[in-house]
A protein has these predicted regions:
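Acceptor-binding helix/loop patch of EC 2.4 sugar-transfer enzymes
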Residues: 8, 15, 57, 101-105, ...
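Membrane-proximal helix-turn-helix segments that form the acceptor-binding/catalytic region
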Residues: 27, 73-80, 115, 119-130
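An amphipathic, basic-hydrophobic alpha-helix
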Residues: 61-86, 96, 128
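Short, charged/polar "capping" segments at the starts of alpha-helices
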Residues: 46-50, 96-97, 117-119
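Extreme N-terminal starter segment of soluble prokaryotic enzymes
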Residues: 1-4
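Flexible, charged surface loops at secondary-structure boundaries
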Residues: 33-34, 78-83, 101-103, 130
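N-terminal strand-loop element at the rim of the active site
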Residues: 6-15, 23-67
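Short His-centered aromatic/hydrophobic patch
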Residues: 89-94, 111
Length: 130
């Protein structure tokens, strides 16, 4: 079963500068029964990744455009080719709004921080959507 893990775009998945979410994902992935069919997607400028199954999403910031929107759009382009069964989203419930055109996939959201303070899960309406 193919699993895609999407890190927050500011999260660094490198040995030199790994964030808490990256360390969590790397640690869990080591013991997963699906580790051979799992890909971790993110954006970093470093080359020494925490695991071999990491895919660096090409990402260039465009003036007056949402960095999150560009990042998720680039991930969706990659995901349309890969066709994972499960997509894990870490710490960014607002990303779910962009995945409406990806069908036949299951989504898992990990909250590493307080969900009531995160964009995309503050209001009752947003939480019902999730």
């Amino acid at each position: 079963m193919k699993v895609s893990i999407l890190l927050p775009y500011k999260e660094d998945y490198s040995k030199e500068n790994a964030g808490a979410v990256s360390i969590f994902v790397s640690g869990i992935d080591k013991y997963s029964r699906y580790r051979r069919s799992t890909k971790v997607y993110g954006n970093t400028n470093y080359k020494n990744f925490l695991s071999k199954n990491y895919v660096n999403i090409p990402f260039k910031k465009i003036f007056l455009q949402s960095s999150s929107k560009i990042y998720v759009k680039n991930f969706i382009d990659l995901e349309k080719q890969r066709k994972s069964k499960i997509i894990e989203i870490h710490n960014r419930p607002s990303y779910l709004n962009y995945f409406t055109n990806l069908q036949k996939r299951k989504f898992v959201i990990y909250f590493h921080n307080d969900p009531l303070t995160m964009s995309g899960s503050v209001t009752i309406k947003e939480r019902l959507f999730i």
